[in-house]
């Protein structure tokens, strides 16, 4: 059995944890075994334990860092597996130097879209075209000739498609107030302060809506103070939701107001759930919604609207458009689920990943 090994020191919930499960599923579809080396207590462990053809090796974080630094010389069984693997997927840029000394081709998975340590990798997998373009400009600015640059490939995440397409039931009550939801960690880069400001603008304009913000994090108290100081009554902090699918089922619109969004897994999940979406013009959303251009007509045909990041007024305008235009809202919902199914399925990711691994040179 062909084995691909993923290595990470990340323990937090979020992008890397979710991506590891996605890679396990894609590799399984493509006929590979996936071995994941990660810290004890990592958020990804529970989900990975249920994936077929996935083998888990966990260590206390300090020991894992030591083993990576010493290239597992004191753990000969894993050292042998790393030497014989079809490929090594490195999920933290700072680990590239140590892991690149093994024989198999290594791929840095650029989850963050940032540029740190990219030049040390032989191969880089980017989640978006914007991230890839930034990296190539950075390599050129450093004077790296094309032959010296890492091989850069765009490999977006894939989504497990439902057995049948999900369609939101049409609103039976024409007077029902539209419900907008957003979710994520309460940190500055997620842009939820902009959503609160946009909620205040909608309230001032007497645009009927309720906004539910799911999440937790260091800025929770700050967001509540902002809501109180603005006197906003149409937005509520709901805490962390373990099962967002039930939240999607009760919502009418999904909003992703991030200042940084390397891909936006939650955006695709909302679209598959049958929600029209509004997202900031960040890396992932621009690829997902902007495939045919960034005009409202073009993005609505892919599932929603884009607006300039960090612009609450533009966000409020986009929300207002979907709230008032139920026909466009419904059409965007149908277009979005179709767009994800056609272009971002797990099968598409598996095919692309298999092609990358098959042509990679040892």
Which role fits each region the language model picked out?
Residues 6-14, 18-68, 145-148:
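N-terminal strand-loop element at the rim of the active site
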Residues 14-22, 178-201, 218-224, 313:
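A conserved mid-protein helix/loop that constitutes part of the nucleotide-sugar donor-binding site
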Residues 70-71, 89-95, 110:
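Short His-centered aromatic/hydrophobic patch
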Residues 122-154, 159-163:
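A short, active-site helix/loop in glycosyltransferases that binds the activated sugar's phosphate group
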Residues 224-239:
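Nucleotide-activated donor-binding/catalytic signature segment of Leloir-type glycosyltransferases, i.e.
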Residues 240, 259:
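Aromatic "clamp/platform" in nucleotide-sugar-dependent glycosyltransferases that forms part
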Residues 276-279, 286-290:
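Short hydrophobic beta-strand element within catalytic cores of glycosyltransferases
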Residues 290-312, 322-326:
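Conserved acidic donor-binding segment of nucleotide-sugar-dependent glycosyltransferases
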């Amino acid at each position: 059995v062909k084995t691909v090994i993923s290595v990470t020191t990340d323990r937090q919930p979020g992008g890397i944890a979710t991506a590891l499960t996605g890679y396990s599923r894609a590799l399984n579809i493509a006929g590979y075994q996936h071995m994941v080396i990660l810290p004890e207590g990592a958020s990804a462990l529970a989900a990975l334990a249920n994936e077929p053809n996935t083998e888990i090796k966990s260590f206390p974080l300090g020991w894992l860092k030591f083993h990576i630094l010493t290239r597992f010389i004191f753990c000969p069984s894993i050292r042998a597996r790393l030497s014989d693997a079809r490929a090594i997927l490195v999920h933290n840029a700072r680990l590239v130097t140590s892991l690149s000394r093994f024989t198999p081709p290594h791929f840095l998975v650029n989850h963050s879209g940032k540029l740190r340590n990219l030049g040390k990798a032989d191969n880089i997998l980017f989640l978006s075209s914007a991230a890839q373009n930034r990296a190539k400009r950075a390599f050129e600015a450093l004077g790296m000739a094309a032959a010296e640059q890492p091989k850069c490939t765009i490999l977006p995440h894939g989504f497990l498609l439902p057995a049948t397409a999900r369609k939101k039931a049409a609103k039976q009550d024409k007077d029902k107030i539209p419900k907008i939801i957003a979710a994520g960690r309460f940190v500055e880069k997620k842009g939820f302060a902009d959503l609160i400001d946009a909620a205040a603008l909608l309230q001032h304009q007497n645009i009927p809506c309720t906004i539910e913000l799911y999440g937790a994090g260091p800025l929770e108290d700050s967001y509540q103070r902002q809501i109180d100081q603005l006197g906003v009554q149409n937005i509520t902090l709901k805490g962390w939701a373990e099962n967002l699918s039930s939240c999607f089922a009760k919502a009418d619109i999904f909003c992703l107001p991030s200042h940084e969004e390397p891909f936006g897994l939650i955006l695709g999940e909302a679209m598959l759930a049958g929600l029209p979406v509004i997202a900031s013009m960040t890396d992932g959303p621009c690829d997902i919604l902007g495939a045919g251009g960034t005009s409202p007509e073009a993005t609505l045909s892919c599932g929603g609207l884009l607006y300039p990041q960090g612009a609450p007024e533009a966000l409020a305008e986009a929300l207002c458009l979907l709230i008032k235009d139920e026909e466009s809202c419904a059409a965007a919902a149908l277009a979005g689920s179709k767009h994800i199914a056609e272009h971002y399925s797990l099968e598409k990711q598996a095919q692309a990943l298999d092609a990358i691994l098959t042509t990679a040179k040892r």
